Amino acid sequence: MELKYVELERNMGAFFDSVIGTLNHIFIGDIIWLSRFKDHSDKYTALLSLEQYPAPNALNDILFTDINDLWKSRIELDETIIRWLSETGESDFQKDFLYENTKGLEFRKNFGEVVSHFFNHQTHHRGQVSTLLKQLGKDIGVTDLIVDIPDSQRST
């Protein structure tokens, strides 16, 4: 699928205007949440690599205008998320999680539920991106997660 920059930046009336705006928002949301998670436990050393990314000033910042740079950084950030998850333990998800939102308000919530929100936030906005791409006439193929889940081999 080929996309021109003018298509990526076209304001299509989405929450974050465009494909590039929405993809940047997903990235920014991930940085914000992962930075909060880093402060939750000293054992989350994978999250120390977050310092390489610029700190966003707002949820609609554009950190990347080049889709290739965004793609490269997205892959790196996803690898960081995978490493971070390997550092978590089941008991981590039962603990309280204290954080401040972007407006400075403090919250105490169950860490497991906050992590669920973290992943659901990505899913929500990725769904918007697939809609925007469809509106641009791009075929992105099947996006159902079930397609990528391998069949289990059971002995009967």
Task: Enumerate the predicted regions with their spans.
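Acidic catalytic patch
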Residues: 87-102
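Short, contiguous alpha-helical
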Residues: 5-55, 101-156
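Helix-adjacent hinge/juxtasegments
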Residues: 43-88
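Charged/polar, solvent-exposed surface patches and flexible loops
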Residues: 2, 10, 35, 69-72, ...
